[in-house]
């Protein structure tokens, strides 16, 4: 009887281990690591682009870069938090090399990066997470994806403004949700975040006088 009990116990443990192993969203974990590195690089890059814009006298564009840099940093933090839930710890970002050029060139670089993330990277990552039923990963990817769409629009306006020789088309004030990284200009500001419902009073503000 004891031998039979031990046999079923061993079988049960083995089945549990197989289930746990099969429930690990391996593709989503790799996607999260890629997105973490990508967002970390963007946060650093846009911060440097903001510094360059201020040097060149484009304070409004600099403020936009600062706000988007913060948004990307929040995305990176969210991605790594999900990785930790999946058992991945002690993760450090791998910052890709980039070059700081003129503000006009930097905006185009940012526009291209946001286009790739919006059109290619995040749609694939979201699909992978949904296929693996990795809900936390899907949520983090979706928050970032929705924010990238807005960033792309903002950088498009910035490009037009520079082409016209004026920053008048850009907002002076920007706001970032500290939970999901959603980004607002003054005209679009809501009482709570469209993505995660965080209250407006908790948003992080950026103005032309940001230090």
State where each predicted segment sits:
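Non-heme di-metal
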Residues: 21-211
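Bacterial N-terminal signal peptides that target proteins for export
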Residues: 1-8
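Bacterial N-terminal signal peptides
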Residues: 8-18
């Amino acid at each position: 009887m004891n031998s039979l009990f031990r046999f079923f116990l061993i079988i049960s443990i083995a089945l549990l281990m197989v289930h746990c192993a099969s429930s690990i969203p391996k593709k989503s974990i790799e996607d999260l690591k890629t997105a973490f590195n990508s967002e970390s690089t963007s946060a650093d890059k846009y911060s440097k682009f903001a510094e360059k814009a201020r040097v060149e006298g484009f304070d409004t564009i600099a403020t936009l870069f600062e706000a988007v840099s913060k948004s990307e940093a929040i995305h990176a933090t969210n991605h790594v938090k999900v990785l930790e839930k999946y058992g991945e710890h002690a993760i450090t970002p791998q910052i890709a090399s980039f070059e700081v050029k003129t503000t006009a060139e930097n905006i185009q670089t940012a526009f291209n990066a946001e286009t790739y993330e919006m059109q290619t990277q995040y749609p694939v990552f979201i699909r992978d997470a949904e296929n693996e039923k990795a809900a936390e990963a899907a949520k983090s990817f979706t928050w970032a994806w929705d924010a990238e769409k807005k960033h792309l629009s903002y950088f498009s306006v910035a490009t037009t403004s520079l082409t016209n020789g004026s920053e008048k088309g850009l907002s002076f004030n920007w706001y970032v949700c500290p939970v999901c990284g959603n980004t607002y200009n003054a005209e679009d500001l809501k009482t709570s975040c469209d993505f995660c419902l965080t209250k407006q009073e908790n948003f992080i503000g950026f103005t032309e006088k940001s230090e």
